[in-house]
């Protein structure tokens, strides 16, 4: 899957979306190496990697900016909220896979289902990993300061 297929067309009536930012070699390399665009990956592995990243970074805003941020349960509430959002996102991915008629040729319905399953497993795993890091950070920090 190449970026140019989506942003460039030779027909001047349709226009071109190529800019120095999205057409540079570094940006193309970055976009081509994102898990959704990487060639040769299994759908479950692709979803697992995407889910881990989302679960890992979603817990922070929920835990630190949520309504329970100043309580003892702020981090747990952030974890539960993150898992809830990941479940909603997985339901959305599964709904897309089963309801849309024109699925891209890279994924069939089974591939989208496997991607959604990997997204959920990876997302929950990433959220639990981030929760553990945030929960035990004071302990690790105290151990590191011991002379």
Curated annotation (Swiss-Prot):
It is a multi-pass membrane protein. The keyword Membrane applies. It is found in: Cell inner membrane. GO terms for biological process: photosynthesis. Keywords: Cell inner membrane, Cell membrane, Membrane, Photosynthesis, Photosystem I, Transmembrane, Transmembrane helix. It comes from the Bacteria. This is Photosystem I reaction center subunit XI. It comes from Gloeobacter violaceus (strain ATCC 29082 / PCC 7421). The gene is psaL.
């Amino acid at each position: 899957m190449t970026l140019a297929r989506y942003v460039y067309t030779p027909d001047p009536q349709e226009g071109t979306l190529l800019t120095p930012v999205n057409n540079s070699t570094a940006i193309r390399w970055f976009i081509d190496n994102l898990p959704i665009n990487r060639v040769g990956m299994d759908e479950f592995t692709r979803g697992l990697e995407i889910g881990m990243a989302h679960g890992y970074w979603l817990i922070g805003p929920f835990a630190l900016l949520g309504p329970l941020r100043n309580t003892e349960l702020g981090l747990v509430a952030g974890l539960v909220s993150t898992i809830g959002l990941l479940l909603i996102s997985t339901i959305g991915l599964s709904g897309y896979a089963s309801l849309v008629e024109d699925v891209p040729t890279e994924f069939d319905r089974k591939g989208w289902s496997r991607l959604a399953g990997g997204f959920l497993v990876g997302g929950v795993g990433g959220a639990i990993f981030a929760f553990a890091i945030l929960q035990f950070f004071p302990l690790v920090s105290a151990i590191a300061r011991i002379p």
